[in-house]
């Protein structure tokens, strides 16, 4: 049978209003104590299970008793006994304090609650003083089975959630127009999203903008209440979120600190607790038997055995044994690379194709001082039988070098990266899209008997002039390849340069220690006559030249014999001239004498027939010089570096670092912002003068020394000539946008020259108008590529 406990509840009869007022006056003095007691002992709640406050009021002043089961169902009325009266009086005294608090807290809200609740289910609370004081207790009515059990209460926290997608990242719905689904499986459309201007206007106009947040589940904007703001402030200030929580409540001693003399449990001990353990007896007997038989050893004996097994200890004096290098050498050894197996060339009777012919033997002997350049470190030999093979003379040396490699060269494992070759190659435009540029050889100018060192083109592009080691200067017609005039000199012609001024017809020829200014007598006759009139007489000058300049250079008119050949002015230097170059206007020209020390570079003015030495100290062995096409700047190239000087301020502007062994030549872009440098160590260097003093790009397109390099005056082209008999034409576009880097694309390799005495192409020069290029070589020819 289900046990039912009778719950006694007392219902008190109503009292008059005056009596209630007198009770409230008596409780005013104890207000603070009642509030504190209410916090400590909240008392009973008058709310039933279904959330409706109900009160029962009797129709008489007698005390009534009711019985109810554990579920709160009404069982009936019962008379109170004497023992129950005493217990009820004690309960009433405790409940009076609770009634005072309830009256103060709900005094203002009772009248409103009366209007809201039905008249049949509510009654007024009454308070009395005396021994028979009682409180009104709510009697739960029976539930109507026709209504839902949880009609007026929330049964789940999830029923209020509109979006049913669950606890997932909401950015999954960024690409969709909806943000989830409601309880009816309908899409929750995202609210319209404003731009930054709308947000700014709302921030200005809406006073509640600062407390508006966006719900990530629905995308709607939620207005935070005052309670939410207070909660956020408390959390932000590191306080307890619940404001009703008292951090300083009186300590409640749940467990006593006094030592209890009586035991917690009063269970008599078992009989076996007084008897010795049988299992321990067996264990001890086994240990005694093991000691007698010698199987079991003492602690000292065990430590002694461990010490003998470990053996003597050795310590590293300078490093630990747990280092990475020690572990690698012990646990991850790297085996020595094996020597290559012998091939057919190392046989005592190799096939005939592996034996050297005269040309291969000469090439092999040529690298006697540089054996690392040889394809084979030995010369294959053929013997009739194995017994005729002599002892190998380099056996001990090779074994010695092998031993050095084994114990001196560090070993390491390298992870091979599988990188596609196309990924490493930069994406460049197709050469077909970069036309026009020279692709074929059109003409060969033959006539010199020795290597041709220099070539220069007339400003109008009709004639060329060449200088050779056969001590002659030849003038050629470009279109026909016919030699118009040959001028003999007394020494080797190192350099020729046609004046860039189209109003003058002058050629500067560097031969030995003399610089000849020649009128070629080709082209317009009026222009030829004007040039002769200009160079006929020396202009008067009041400037007194120093002895330093007089000993270095002397101006003079040509002899009558040379006048007939076209020579007009002779400038004699104190050292052999290597290079001559013109200024863009055609009035100044510079010469280079590598052996001249601090007077290696000289600048000559044609109109005033005077010279000047720009440098008083030698900064190195000068190789070549160059004028800036626009600015009054002077480029001086030594063996390793290039210095740029301002001729007006007479100061050093910039020093370019080439990181090369020996500079052979240089050429400047027509705009003057980029410089090309050729070196004898097979490199071409592109300098961006506005970017850095180091090369913007280093090109290694040739297999041998690069002797000459040149920019085209009109087209974005440049070319280089090398001792590998090749002329490489490249595309070099320089953009007006300073933020865009130059575009460099190799286009064509023209290799038609013949190699003589280890020399190939000696000089290259562009046609001033057409995309044509002239090259001179050691094969005594001049070749035109178009």
Curated annotation (Swiss-Prot):
Family: Belongs to the WD repeat BOP1/ERB1 family.
Subcellular location: Nucleus, Nucleolus; Nucleus, Nucleoplasm
Protein name: Ribosome biogenesis protein BOP1 homolog
Domain of life: Eukaryota
Per-repeat ranges for WD: 447-488, 490-528, 572-614, 617-655, 658-697, 701-740, 756-786
Region described as Disordered: 1-161
UniProt GO MF annotations: ribonucleoprotein complex binding
GO cellular component, one term: PeBoW complex
Polar residues bias spans: 17-26, 122-135
InterPro entries from the UniProt entry: BOP1/Erb1, BOP1_N_dom, WD40/YVTN_repeat-like_dom_sf, WD40_repeat_CS, WD40_repeat_dom_sf, WD40_rpt
Biased composition (Basic and acidic residues): 141-150
Pfam family, one: BOP1NT
Main location: nucleus
UniProt key word Repeat: yes
A Gene Ontology BP annotation from the UniProt entry: regulation of hemocyte proliferation
Species per Swiss-Prot/TrEMBL record: Drosophila grimshawi (Hawaiian fruit fly)
Alphabetized UniProt keyword annotations: Nucleus, Repeat, Ribosome biogenesis, rRNA processing, WD repeat
Biased composition range(s): Acidic residues: 44-53, 60-72, 82-114, 151-160
Function: Required for maturation of ribosomal RNAs and formation of the large ribosomal subunit.
């Amino acid at each position: 049978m289900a046990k039912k406990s009778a719950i006694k509840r007392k219902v008190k009869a109503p009292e008059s209003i005056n009596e209630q007022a007198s009770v409230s006056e008596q409780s005013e003095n104890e207000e603070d104590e009642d509030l504190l007691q209410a916090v400590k002992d909240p008392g009973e709640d008058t709310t039933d299970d279904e959330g409706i406050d109900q009160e029962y009021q009797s129709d008489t002043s007698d005390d009534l008793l009711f019985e109810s089961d554990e579920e709160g169902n009404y069982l009936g009325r019962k008379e109170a006994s004497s023992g129950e009266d005493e217990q009820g009086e004690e309960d009433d005294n405790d409940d009076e304090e609770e009634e005072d608090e309830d009256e103060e807290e709900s005094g203002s809200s009772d009248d409103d609650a009366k209007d809201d609740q039905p008249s049949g289910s509510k009654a007024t609370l009454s308070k009395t003083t005396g021994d028979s004081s009682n409180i009104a207790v709510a009697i739960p009515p029976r539930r109507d089975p026709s209504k839902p059990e949880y009609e007026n209460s929330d049964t789940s926290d999830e029923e209020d959630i509109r979006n049913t997608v669950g606890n997932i990242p909401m950015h999954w719905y960024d690409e969709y127009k909806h943000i989830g689904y409601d309880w009816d499986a309908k899409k929750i459309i995202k609210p319209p999203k404003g731009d930054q201007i709308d947000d700014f206007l709302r921030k200005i106009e809406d006073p509640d903008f600062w407390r508006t947040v966006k719900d990530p589940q629905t995308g709607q904007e939620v207005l935070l209440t005052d309670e939410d703001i207070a909660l956020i402030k408390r959390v932000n200030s590191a306080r307890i979120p619940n404001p009703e929580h008292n951090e300083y409540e009186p300590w409640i001693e749940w467990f006593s600190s006094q030592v209890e003399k009586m035991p917690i449990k009063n269970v008599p001990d078992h009989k076996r607790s007084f008897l010795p353990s049988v299992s321990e007896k067996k264990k001890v007997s086994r240990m005694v038997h093991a000691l007698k038989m010698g199987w079991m050893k003492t602690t000292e004996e065990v430590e002694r055995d461990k010490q003998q097994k470990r053996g003597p200890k050795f310590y590293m004096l300078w490093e630990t044994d747990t280092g990475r290098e020690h572990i690698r050498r012990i646990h991850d050894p790297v085996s020595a690379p094996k020597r290559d197996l012998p091939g057919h060339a190392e046989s005592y009777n190799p096939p005939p194709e592996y034996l050297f012919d005269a040309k291969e033997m000469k090439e092999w002997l040529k690298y006697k001082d540089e054996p690392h350049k040889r394809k084979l470190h030995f010369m294959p030999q053929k013997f009739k039988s194995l017994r005729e093979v002599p002892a190998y003379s380099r056996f001990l040396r090779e074994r010695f070098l092998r031993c050095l490699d084994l114990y001196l060269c560090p070993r390491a494992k390298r992870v091979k990266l599988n990188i596609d070759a196309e990924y490493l190659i930069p994406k460049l435009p197709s050469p077909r899209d970069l036309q026009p540029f020279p692709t074929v050889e059109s003409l060969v100018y033959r006539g010199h008997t020795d290597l041709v060192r220099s070539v220069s083109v007339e400003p109008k592009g009709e004639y060329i002039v060449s200088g050779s080691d056969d001590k002659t200067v030849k003038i050629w017609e470009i279109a026909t390849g016919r030699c118009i005039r040959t001028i003999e000199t007394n020494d080797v012609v190192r350099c020729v340069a046609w004046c860039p001024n189209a109003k003058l017809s002058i050629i500067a020829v560097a031969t030995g220690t003399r610089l000849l200014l020649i009128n070629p007598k080709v082209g317009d006759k009026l222009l030829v006559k004007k040039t002769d009139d200009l160079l006929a007489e020396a202009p008067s000058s009041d400037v007194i030249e120093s002895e330093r300049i007089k000993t270095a250079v002397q101006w003079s008119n040509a002899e009558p014999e040379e006048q007939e050949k076209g020579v007009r002015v002779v400038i004699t230097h104190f050292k052999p001239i290597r290079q001559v170059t013109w200024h863009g206007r055609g009035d100044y020209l510079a010469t280079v004498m590598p052996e001249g020390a601090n007077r290696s570079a000289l600048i000559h003015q044609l109109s005033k027939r005077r010279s000047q030495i720009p440098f008083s100290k030698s900064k190195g062995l000068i190789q070549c010089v160059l004028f800036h096409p626009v600015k009054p700047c002077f480029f001086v190239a030594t063996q390793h570096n290039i210095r740029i000087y301002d001729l007006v301020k007479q100061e050093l502007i910039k020093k370019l670092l080439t990181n090369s062994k020996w500079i052979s030549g240089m050429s400047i872009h027509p705009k003057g912002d980029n410089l090309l440098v050729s070196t004898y160590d097979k490199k071409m260097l592109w300098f961006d003068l506005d970017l850095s003093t180091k090369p913007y790009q280093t090109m290694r397109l040739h297999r041998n020394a690069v002797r000459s390099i040149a920019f085209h005056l009109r087209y974005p082209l440049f070319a280089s000539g090398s001792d590998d008999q090749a002329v490489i034409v490249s595309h070099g576009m320089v953009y007006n946008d300073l933020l865009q880097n130059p575009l460099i694309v190799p286009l064509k390799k023209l290799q038609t020259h013949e190699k003589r005495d280890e020399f190939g192409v000696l000089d290259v020069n562009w046609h001033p108008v057409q995309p044509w290029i002239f090259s001179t070589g050691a094969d005594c020819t001049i070749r035109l590529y178009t």
